[in-house]
Amino acid sequence: MVSLKSLAAILVAMFLATGPTVLAQQCRDELSNVQVCAPLLLPGAVNPAANSNCCAALQATNKDCLCNALRAATTLTSLCNLPSFDCGISA
């Protein structure tokens, strides 16, 4: 029979192993919800006004997920062996 300490150790190991996967899935879901804001970000949008769906999605999005996605986007050029570029945005 498995001791209580062994069971606790197994549960902790399972949590640690699945933590990044769960966080990645959570971020993926939250970031996909922010797609309702895409029309506000497209070139040519004249005086875009945020709608309630965009604002609600943005408010519900984990800020770390959003910031990490933006940081990751800036590395895409190097991952694709393309020249880097600067959009004039500082974070």
Curated annotation (Swiss-Prot):
Belongs to the A9/FIL1 family. The keyword Secreted applies. This is Tapetum-specific protein A9. The keyword Disulfide bond applies. Keywords: Disulfide bond, Secreted, Signal. Its main location: secreted. SUPFAM superfamilies: Bifunctional inhibitor/lipid-transfer protein/seed storage 2S albumin (SSF47699). It is found in: Secreted. Residues 1-24 form the signal peptide. Tapetum of anthers. Disulfide bonds join 27-65, 37-54, 55-80, 67-87. One of its GO terms (cellular component) is exine. The gene is A9. Pfam families: LTP_2 (PF14368).
